[in-house]
Amino acid sequence: MGNCVGRQRRERPAAPGHPRKRAGRNEPLKKERLKWKSDYPMTDGQLRSKRDEFWDTAPAFEGRKEIWDALKAAAYAAEANDHELAQAILDGASITLPHGTLCECYDELGNRYQLPIYCLSPPVNLLLEHTEEESLEPPEPTPSVRREFPLKVRLSTGKDVRLNASLPDTVGQLKRQLHSQEGIEPSWQRWFFSGKLLTDRTRLQETKIQKDFVIQVIINQPPPPQD
């Protein structure tokens, strides 16, 4: 389990104005998934709510917003088993891990950042919310008036983009729209919402996204061919 504590109480960062000196060592991010058990069985929706609460409020306590954004993107990538991308995000933001986990991190100024374990992996006693429809093909939307709304997506480059979306749209369709607007190939895009990787066949209405919510898009562009 590394140095994370398998409990739900959130560890807040150190008090503002008193950054802790970071450890002298920096270990690469470990690939094994941290295991923990919740004090009570929780659903996927409850886990998302806890994560949203943490990510929405953590930057208000201490630390730099760009570091919190990088840690959030790295946590999403690691949970999706894209450890190479997660490590690249950490290295790009000059974040060090004295124990090789995201439970305790330091920026280049020596500020300490602590992530609760529930932001890094689901509990072993997570309650799965299955329905009969999940095993079937996604139903085609019935012909009706398309009700569009502006969907805000935040790229891992830090840029915010607004797409014209409707609830029946699939993530695959929105990836192609982002490609037409920003030139980012759909195969380079990984979409996350509330810590969950969204597949191309996922419809927006299935994510329970609400107005003013933001979808994270991690861009994993392949390196250019060498001469």
Curated annotation (Swiss-Prot):
Biased composition regions of type Basic and acidic residues, renumbered to the chain: 24-38
Record domain Ubiquitin-like: where: 149-224
Region (Disordered): 1-42
PANTHER family given in the database record: UBIQUITIN DOMAIN CONTAINING 1 PROTEIN-RELATED
Function description: May be involved in the regulation of cellular senescence through a positive feedback loop with TP53. Is a TP53 downstream target gene that increases the stability of TP53 protein by promoting the ubiquitination and degradation of MDM2.
Subunit composition and interactions: Interacts with UBTD1.
Name this polypeptide is given: Ubiquitin domain-containing protein 1
Source organism of the structure: Mus musculus (Mouse)
Phylogenetic classification of the source organism: Eukaryota, Metazoa, Chordata, Craniata, Vertebrata
